[in-house]
Design a protein with these regions (language model features):
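C-terminal-most transmembrane helix of multi-pass membrane proteins
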Residues: 2-8, 57, 156-157, 231, ...
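Specific transmembrane alpha-helical segments of multi-pass solute transporters/efflux pumps
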Residues: 28, 69-113, 117, 154, ...
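Hydrophobic/aromatic residues within transmembrane alpha-helices
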Residues: 35, 52, 104, 130-133, ...
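Transmembrane alpha-helices of multi-pass small-molecule transport proteins
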Residues: 38-93, 123-127, 180-187, 202-220, ...
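Loop-to-transmembrane alpha-helix entry segments
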Residues: 117, 133-154, 164-170, 281-301
Length: 311
């Protein structure tokens, strides 16, 4: 009897799971800006930004660990063989990615940051094919990534002055964050085949979050909420973003090729633009036609990468 595919390995499951993740991650962009205001963090206070990030990911790790321990009716405790992948993932996925992201974002333009961030999806597919040799690169994957990147570039360049500055501690840090994120995507796919992906996600968040918190604290960072209740509600939601999205993403990478999952990441900046416009009133000058064309390009790239091969 033929074994049935896990739901997340089917095309409907893949699409639904990826879009849920992308919507959650897209909401993080406006939430970070709202969080800076609620916690009284100035634009160039790197120490407090890292402390804020560390608190978010520490809570995310605790939520995954406690939640899954209750659901499974046993402690979600890593075994000895899980320690190494947890440390490697926390180094790339949380510490490396978000150390550079939170510092670089305060010094880079939103336009250039979004475009660089979108390249993580292309880099993940390139790393999977050329560095880790977990899958092969083909014309469809390259074309799909190119269309997705074009869509993100279009929606970010519209209404801008067309300039694309670059400074090492700004866009350079965003690029370093992007490389770390792309590498972590490949590593999650590899480790999740032999280890519990949710366990890895929870513990690497906790380890990475504690490291970022320590760095921010030692640098002199402080958090001074202007209003307690909204600030607490926001940090809880941001922890939920990380806990749910990364746990689900790990499951998707465990049962699908990296290329099929990563190409959906081009939806992150699209959700980010739409939610920033809705929650922050940003991008008022962006034409609805431009957004629609960008969405079509991104969706076209996703379809090309996920198109079934002819028998």
């Amino acid at each position: 009897m033929e074994s049935r595919k896990p739901y997340l390995a089917t095309l409907p499951g893949l699409i639904l799971g990826c879009l849920v993740c992308c919507a959650l991650w897209g909401s993080a962009f406006p939430c970070i800006k709202i969080g800076y205001a609620l916690f009284g963090i100035p634009a160039h206070d790197s120490a407090s930004q890292l402390l804020f990030a560390g608190l978010r990911f520490t809570l995310a790790g605790m939520r995954v660990i406690v939640g899954m321990s209750v659901a499974q009716r046993r402690p979600l405790v890593p075994q000895t063989r899980d320690i190494k992948p947890i440390c490697i993932l926390s180094l790339f996925q949380t510490i490396g990615q978000y150390f550079f992201f939170y510092l670089g974002l305060s010094r880079a333009s939103a336009m250039s940051s979004s475009i660089i961030e979108a390249s993580a999806n292309f880099l993940a597919i390139l790393f999977a094919a050329l560095a880790f040799h977990t899958e092969k690169l083909n014309t469809a994957k390259v074309l799909g990534c190119a269309l997705g990147f074009a869509g993100v570039a279009l929606v970010n360049l519209s209404g801008a002055d067309g300039t694309f500055g670059f400074r090492l501690d700004g866009e350079g840090f965003i690029l370093a964050s992007t490389v770390a994120g792309a590498l972590s995507t490949c590593l999650i796919g590899i480790f999740s085949r032999k280890h519990d992906g949710v366990l890895l996600a929870g513990w690497q968040f906790l380890v990475g979050g504690l490291v970022l918190t320590a760095i921010g604290f030692l640098m002199g960072g402080t958090l001074s909420p202007t209003t307690i209740a909204p600030a607490i509600a926001l940090i809880i939601y941001m922890a939920l973003i990380s806990a749910v999205a990364y746990s689900l993403w790990s499951r998707l990478l465990a049962v699908n090729p990296v290329s099929r999952v990563s190409v959906f990441g081009f939806m992150n900046p699209v959700f980010g633009v739409l939610l920033s416009a809705l929650l922050l009133g940003e991008g008022a000058g962006t034409s609805p036609v431009t957004v629609i064309v960008a969405l079509l390009l991104v969706c076209g790239g996703i379809i090309i990468v996920n198109k079934p091969k002819k028998a």
